């Protein structure tokens, strides 16, 4: 366990931003923290990183825990080069390893624009530098507050391939908030938040299984309903909670009786809408 909270609550006057939130972050996990705008995501990160005090509740940290944060808005200087920005930040730490910083530069792929001013970089390049800055002190836990917002799909994939590599090679634990739900599809632990309340939690697969089961719709030639199916219109029937192998098995066994079929694999987006009644935009 790296961080655990119990009854975490934050009020701004009469407004309740967080309401009795219980969170546990275990080492090596990808933790996805999802919610619409104003749900309380950034408030939670600010509290967990010590930038904001909770109104009530307790937070337990692992001994000697090191934390890195990639904020929505960069904290680096647009007028300094990438190299100067990183080395200036590195010197703020008591124990600064030049070897580790050079390794980071290679690992994250920012060597080509080290001598460019930070303010002249593309969105994806800036984000990579922001991640490097957050990893200078070799943190155990990296908080990412909507790290790919505003980036195109290709750049988002580059950033996520990088983060997965860091998690695998460095044993990094990641706490993620995001507007792109596909980035949370493989989360080890997920929390879905709305109006400061946690509505659902579990692994991504558990959340999908409970709130967004896959559906197979079939049209049978003889209009005979398959076992455990639900009857729809136009001689169609629906079967829930089948995984891919079960779908293939069913279609193979009944291929002579099936006129048409449609398979919808449940997603985090489906689960999110089911839980909150809203789309994440």
Regions inferred by a protein language model and the residue ranges of each:
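Conserved ABC ATPase "signature" region
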Residues: 87, 96-113
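Conserved ABC ATPase signature
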Residues: 117-121
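Conserved catalytic motifs of ABC-family nucleotide-binding domains
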Residues: 138
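Catalytic Walker B motif of ABC-type/P-loop ATPase nucleotide-binding domains
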Residues: 142-145
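Short, charged/small-residue-rich alpha-helical element at the C-terminal edge
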Residues: 213-281
